[in-house]
Amino acid sequence: MGYLYPLLIIISIASLILDYLYLISKKSAIEIVNDMGIGYNLGYLFDCYNTSEEIKTPNEQITLWGNSPPNKQLFNFLKKSGFKTIRFPITWMHFMDDSGKVNPLWMSRVKEVVKWIIDANMYCIIDVHNDATDRNWLSEGIASKYKFKYLWEQIANEFLRILMKNIYYLKL
């Protein structure tokens, strides 16, 4: 039952984004999904969590599990290799204050990667990831609903300026 509210927000956001994509592309939701084609998961970079180390900078989180940070060339290579969609899982909890405000350095780093994906003419699926796992901030009850809504407001406000092919969802 605790996931009902976030799920309703997700459905509403997805519906609004698909409506927006239809307006700018004149494609139906089915056509957009079909156009997304083969996807690539950009995992184990921005979604690290549950560590004993304190994470202070975006680069510390991105490299925490031993991976190299992504770069623009990666997305150009993936596009040339036939991928059309990038799933971009992001864990926000290390870069949010108690009210849910996202650290501007983290949002800037996320935005940089999204821009590279869009510049490569690919779809980008932003996935609020690991924040909803057991014992993380999205399991804190009613207070987490407001933080969750505030997080998506920040994401939407940040990316509305560059929104051409972005679809947002939460993995529950």
Which positions does each model-derived feature cover?
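Feature marks short, highly hydrophobic, charge-poor N-terminal signal-anchor/signal peptide-like helices
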Residues: 2-6
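Single-pass alpha-helical transmembrane signal-anchor segments in small membrane proteins across taxa
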Residues: 8, 12-16
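N-terminal carbohydrate-binding accessory modules
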Residues: 19-85
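Structural recognition of the beta-strand scaffold that forms the well-ordered cores
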Residues: 37-42, 85-89, 124-127, 168-171
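An active-site-proximal structural segment forming one wall of the substrate-binding cleft
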Residues: 66-83, 102-128, 138-169
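Aromatic-lined carbohydrate-binding/catalytic grooves of carbohydrate-active enzymes
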Residues: 83-104
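Active-site-proximal loop/turn and secondary-structure-junction residues that shape catalytic pockets
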Residues: 92-94, 130-134
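Short Asp/Glu-rich motifs
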Residues: 97-98, 135-137
